Amino acid sequence: MMRTTEDFHKPSATLNSNTATKGRYIYLEAFLEGGAPWGFTLKGGLEHGEPLIISKVEEGGKADTLSSKLQAGDEVVHINEVTLSSSRKEAVSLVKGSYKTLRLVVRRDVCTDPGHADTGASNFVSPEHLTSGPQHRKAAWSGGVKLRLKHRRSEPAGRPHSWHTTKSGEKQPDASMMQISQGMIGPPWHQSYHSSSSTSDLSNYDHAYLRRSPDQCSSQGSMESLEPSGAYPPCHLSPAKSTGSIDQLSHFHNKRDSAYSSFSTSSSILEYPHPGISGRERSGSMDNTSARGGLLEGMRQADIRYVKTVYDTRRGVSAEYEVNSSALLLQGREARASANGQGYDKWSNIPRGKGVPPPSWSQQCPSSLETATDNLPPKVGAPLPPARSDSYAAFRHRERPSSWSSLDQKRLCRPQANSLGSLKSPFIEEQLHTVLEKSPENSPPVKPKHNYTQKAQPGQPLLPTSIYPVPSLEPHFAQVPQPSVSSNGMLYPALAKESGYIAPQGACNKMATIDENGNQNGSGRPGFAFCQPLEHDLLSPVEKKPEATAKYVPSKVHFCSVPENEEDASLKRHLTPPQGNSPHSNERKSTHSNKPSSHPHSLKCPQAQAWQAGEDKRSSRLSEPWEGDFQEDHNANLWRRLEREGLGQSLSGNFGKTKSAFSSLQNIPESLRRHSSLELGRGTQEGYPGGRPTCAVNTKAEDPGRKAAPDLGSHLDRQVSYPRPEGRTGASASFNSTDPSPEEPPAPSHPHTSSLGRRGPGPGSASALQGFQYGKPHCSVLEKVSKFEQREQGSQRPSVGGSGFGHNYRPHRTVSTSSTSGNDFEETKAHIRFSESAEPLGNGEQHFKNGELKLEEASRQPCGQQLSGGASDSGRGPQRPDARLLRSQSTFQLSSEPEREPEWRDRPGSPESPLLDAPFSRAYRNSIKDAQSRVLGATSFRRRDLELGAPVASRSWRPRPSSAHVGLRSPEASASASPHTPRERHSVTPAEGDLARPVPPAARRGARRRLTPEQKKRSYSEPEKMNEVGIVEEAEPAPLGPQRNGMRFPESSVADRRRLFERDGKACSTLSLSGPELKQFQQSALADYIQRKTGKRPTSAAGCSLQEPGPLRERAQSAYLQPGPAALEGSGLASASSLSSLREPSLQPRREATLLPATVAETQQAPRDRSSSFAGGRRLGERRRGDLLSGANGGTRGTQRGDETPREPSSWGARAGKSMSAEDLLERSDVLAGPVHVRSRSSPATADKRQDVLLGQDSGFGLVKDPCYLAGPGSRSLSCSERGQEEMLPLFHHLTPRWGGSGCKAIGDSSVPSECPGTLDHQRQASRTPCPRPPLAGTQGLVTDTRAAPLTPIGTPLPSAIPSGYCSQDGQTGRQPLPPYTPAMMHRSNGHTLTQPPGPRGCEGDGPEHGVEEGTRKRVSLPQWPPPSRAKWAHAAREDSLPEESSAPDFANLKHYQKQQSLPSLCSTSDPDTPLGAPSTPGRISLRISESVLRDSPPPHEDYEDEVFVRDPHPKATSSPTFEPLPPPPPPPPSQETPVYSMDDFPPPPPHTVCEAQLDSEDPEGPRPSFNKLSKVTIARERHMPGAAHVVGSQTLASRLQTSIKGSEAESTPPSFMSVHAQLAGSLGGQPAPIQTQSLSHDPVSGTQGLEKKVSPDPQKSSEDIRTEALAKEIVHQDKSLADILDPDSRLKTTMDLMEGLFPRDVNLLKENSVKRKAIQRTVSSSGCEGKRNEDKEAVSMLVNCPAYYSVSAPKAELLNKIKEMPAEVNEEEEQADVNEKKAELIGSLTHKLETLQEAKGSLLTDIKLNNALGEEVEALISELCKPNEFDKYRMFIGDLDKVVNLLLSLSGRLARVENVLSGLGEDASNEERSSLYEKRKILAGQHEDARELKENLDRRERVVLGILANYLSEEQLQDYQHFVKMKSTLLIEQRKLDDKIKLGQEQVKCLLESLPSDFIPKAGALALPPNLTSEPIPAGGCTFSGIFPTLTSPL
């Protein structure tokens, strides 16, 4: 370039013509100020195989106003002092990352076009020029560039994550391409010091530069926001932040994103830079790492000011300049030049190193390393940035805090500190793996990433730098390593893993760095690179040893001296990084210098340093608040990394343990692993030290502690659990002992075997093995396990092969990484979790040991684990490709691992490394593509798809039930089992924690990142708080405490975790079923179940009852439900076997899905509810975990659980969405198929339902089940505001506890244990019993006890009260009381529930057994307590609760009333009605928002369940009789859809009354008069505290209704209210009519009619209604042609039937709506005569009820039924004349009803206008408060809401029509017609299912939007928004219903008119016809209804 580095560094105000004209090129520097737009356009780039040139300069733009204008054709060489790799993406990201200023250096071909002539060549010439100008720069750039190029080459492999990268990856073989692709970012750093830096140079490395680099990176500030990526450099976090989860995944491989990487990396580097290389190197090398790190890095780079660590060849010093990317650009350019010249030489090696990280890392074989060394001497100087590592410690602490820390630390670090820091312990304990996995894959990892350092990516190199260069590793390790480990070290391994190519890039850089000073590479990309290098070292003892020892060691040394050095290096790395960090550049440089010569330790030191760097980072991380925790993570991760990369030693000596642990690590997806490495990996990389750093970190006496055997042991133990004692002391000692070269030589001697051999053979390895318990035996076990896993997981675990390959190259870390890429990370996470769980349990050592075996077994089972087996790694080298593919499968894994593998692969042949890299890139890219497609497939939240390891998980899941693997995901469980088995078993016992571990990997594997604003805010990638909720640690329940405490992980990678859980759980859950298969399976099972139980196959049943299968099933399987269940199951149901037994084949997947979601929910919820319900929940979760451990582990409990679970799976599984509760189980014990109910609603419905159910019905149960009651009910209550986010959380939470709590997990709750024996057993019995609910009730009791006990003493009594009858009987009551006990519930209930419910519950206290009996009895005769309880709950929730309570007991038919209440509540809970099962399901989804309150009422849900499944016996028996006798008692709040059930049980109070009462009930303080506002508030509140509000609504409503219905019914039931009530009745009565029909003796019509009459006219029908019914019956009896239309049969489907599950009719919403309407119509109603009013009510109710969609025909249907029974007394003539008269009379009556309906429609339109006005207000408010992108999300959501609702209505109407026609087809219908109809139905059904999925997606978006708005809006405003949204869909549906009813009425009138003789003149005179019919001539003759009816019915 024309300017020296310094010059370049200097800001230039103008386009400098200071052009270095070299040859035909002149370099111009343009300094643009003012911010974007900059006024020029870039085109070409590596991605397109063209030079990156300025295609056009906009006139008048900033670029056009320069003195020396930029010209089209100018090739952009540097941006912000970052040497470009010619990647357009990188350039774009750099430009975008520029804040106020943009510094460009362009090369202009003076000979040809000024701009582009030989841009490509020029690029490389440029570096020379640039280099030549500033020689040091040249060297640095050359080296860096070369490295970068090399890395770039490799990078494509890693980069493939991004599609662009993939493209470039294909071109990667070209060194220059590589250079461009990879050199782009990372290389600059690497090259920076690579060519210019020397070991000694590093000594000159200016820490200040490193330190200040973060600050210096002005870009960093902006990128800092992106930094979260920085936080997750290894993970594709940056991309998550910057681009997307896929990009993030790609970011590893996106060198085109290199700019992002550069930013990210730069930022990272700047932050992590200490380990850095030269400033430039740092930015470059780090960048490379970062680049590998992915967009994350790129983002960071943008955010970061690049510290150009320029190694001044002349000065022999590496100076760190804040290049603002310019240095990087220069470096890149030089790198390019170098790449052409020396760069290529180095690249030949380095490319291999990069392309073939192994060679690169291994020093790319001796030659590569040596060449790297030779070429990289300057670069070695760059490694001085290890000094940076020294400064890294400070830097990491300081710098990171400055840049990464300042922003990321605050944003990521702190969140991570909180997330990772706090999470760290928990994370390490339980969530570390999760976080790691997530962090790499998810933005959430951003925080975790950040925790382990996004910046650490650049820092990762820093880590290696710290790792390898830090001679005074031990001294500084305590401080620096931690940061290195934490951010960089971990990151590095993650990076290395993350990108085989990254590693290559890092390897290249690091290789170059490390090659020169093994450490430097570590610095550049030490952690990651060094990991690989270590393996490479292992692979190439010769080159590796010499260079590893000298330079390569640092990064490779980690592996290099895997056995001895690794251990020692590990320790040293732990310690050395501090050295590196402390010494900073000098020390590091000296270390680098020394390393080659002075450190035998050098080799081991570099390795140790790498380890130490990791540990150092960890240490420093420890130093940082968050670091302490994180260090543990890192230790675990580093340990993993060590195991992976450095585990050679670990694997060798400690490898038995380490390997076990590592194996688990391996099992963790490579990506995860990388991330793990980043997060855990830092610790893991530190390997044992890192893993131990958990201890070491915790000890923070890192140097001594970490260095000390204990530290390592700790880390190892942490990682491996069992090695904890030995690993800690022994392993640590091993590391130290083994660190010596003795092992290293062996390792080097056998690269693959050596790596393993090293791991195994080295003393360190031996020690490690000893420490691990399994030295070589472990390896053999690993091998065996690997074989097992291979066999088991087959191709799924190719990752194992890949791991094996990785293991060979990066056998320890990489292989493990690769192998465990999916599993390893999971395992690592699991390990960490186990460690966390075990450690927290205090059995870390033992656990680890046990876990190791188990992990070995399990891990080994997964290929990843096999990979862990060092020996098997070598043997599996060939499998690597598979592993790579497998790894690829795991997107994250693929990203990291494959790259790594190629590196390792290349390692064998240093020169071929690039080639390998290219193929690897392709293979990797293919893998990535596969993974991406999977991820995309998983976008449906189907973890199954996502779970690359998930399938294994599924497989493993099965074994898991039998083994302790349950806790862990199959990959993790199996793979992780071996290393983590102890933990796993440990976890298994506390299944939750265990599962949580597996789950997190799944989530990560899922690679689907959902980011919520909060998540982004918190740095965890998913927008769904659900992710947070599903914070995905099943373990979270138990480790919830830690995890929630260390929620960093969950928070940071909540989405990932959720995904992990979902995916893993889902995989486990589904076992071998694919998502779709499982979905279908579940749907079918649910449908079958419903069909069996109800006699009718719900159309939506699959989607409705089995909504889980439908929208939900996907959802369930998606993170929310499926994964949760799996996780929950594994975790919640500690005993895998019992879990397995518990699970029914069909239900099992669903249930797992349910469980996992619960787990996920819990985990995810943790962050969400962390402040309130989380704290309690977390503790509870922990307790619960303990309980689970004690209880779940307990054979009885386990067995019981097993017994119970099978049923529970049925009822529960089906009910996952419903959040089955003990009550549910009890209620539905007879219909155990209940599981079909599991997810009646789609994700939203399920989430809501679950939430509500958990809160309400299952609330008690959920409480028990939910590790955190708070999470359950509390979360639920919180969920109203956080509903969207929390909703799922609670659901998951609840599901988790609920799952476990179902019969086991709930018991597993801390409080459950005590009550567990009796209650649980009872529960289980109940569960097994045909009455699943009572058991659930018992569980609820337990739950209450568990949740409440931990939370409140009352909880215990409550549980006892609630457990059986209460809960089961009044799912709502039980649940409601329980939820109150949960913090959220309590808050929701205002504590009243807590206090009040106990009484009722106390009564019910005998409940567990009573619950079973009661639950059973409940069907027969619901005990009074539930209603009172419910009332009490309502009381608790509301002040009205007492009246409610008193009134509830007042009900004579309390049972019925309760049932009614329960049913209605249930209905609400389960959406309008589960009986509506199928139709209800979809409604349920929508209802879930509004319905959540409804659902909250457990009774309704429970009743509903009863109704659906037990409904036939119960409703018919109680319903029918109750219906009529009970008509007087008002049903529970109509809003809860009580009407339907009320009708079933007894006639519901007038809709108005009911609604009014409900409103009042719902609004404790809201008086009836304020219905409009109240309804709105109620709805909001409903959402807020679905259980309480709803319960209140139900009970209070019921009580009030009872008391006031009679008095106020007449006067207060206006048509609109009626209409609402009627609607409820309709949804419950009409839509559930079929159910009613089945349930009630009366067919739906009569039931509906009765409901209508009872509802509208109060218990008494208006005379007109009665007359209409009688007329209809008589007419139908006499004129069968009109039977269909006049007697709407339940068999006829209506639009509402099909809409039922999707948009659960929120009675509250309707209530609100009706309230408004009521207010409007009240005058009309009251003004009207009583008869008229009754008529109106009837009409409205009919309208609302639309019994069979025909509101008008509701009474008629009843009449028709009666008519059928009426004897034909009159002779035909008389009959005919009489019939005609009756028809005329009926026409008049129908006409009147139509008028009423028209009035109702008018009021509805008014409501719609009002709601739209409200929506406009809300929108205006939101537009002012929210960010534009958030506002866009809101607008898009609202717009899509309309579209989706209308689409569903349209499709539902068409489908209903077709189905009605089909059902009406006679036997004479032609096959052609029938087949045509079937085809239409099939098509429509498919479209409807798609629309339902859209609805699910919409529900997810709704939660996201709600989460966003919750941050801006006040509670009242939020309630307005929620009310608006709920009412929007509700009003649309109601409008359609009214239209359908009106249409039906008109059709009925029309048919009646047509059936009348043309000459007929009614005696009463002319017929009063509806306006639209008056003009129509009345055709003579009868109209065949059959022909018309289907048509009529269909719209209805």
UniProtKB/Swiss-Prot annotation:
Residues 25-110 form the PDZ domain. SMART domains: PDZ. Residues 700-718, 826-836, 846-859, 897-909, 1011-1027, 1403-1417, 1498-1515, 1651-1665 have a biased composition (Basic and acidic residues). InterPro entries: ASD1_dom (IPR014800), ASD2_dom (IPR014799), PDZ (IPR001478), PDZ_sf (IPR036034), Shroom_fam (IPR027685). It is a peripheral membrane protein. One of its GO terms (molecular function) is actin filament binding. GO terms for biological process: actin filament organization; apical protein localization; cell morphogenesis; cellular pigment accumulation; pattern specification process; regulation of cell shape. Residues 750-768, 950-964, 1137-1148 have a biased composition (Low complexity). The keyword Membrane applies. Residues 1524-1536 have a biased composition (Pro residues). It is found in: Cell junction, Adherens junction; Cytoplasm, Cytoskeleton; Apical cell membrane. It comes from the Eukaryota. Residues 928-1030 form the ASD1 domain. Residues 1669-1957 form the ASD2 domain. GO terms for cellular component: adherens junction; apical junction complex; apical plasma membrane; cortical actin cytoskeleton; cytoskeleton; microtubule. SUPFAM superfamilies: PDZ domain-like (SSF50156). Signal peptide: none annotated. PANTHER family: APICAL PROTEIN/SHROOM-RELATED, PROTEIN SHROOM3. The ASD1 domain mediates F-actin binding. The ASD2 domain mediates the interaction with ROCK1 and is required for apical constriction induction. This is Protein Shroom3. It comes from Homo sapiens (Human). The lineage of its organism: Eukaryota, Metazoa, Chordata, Craniata, Vertebrata.
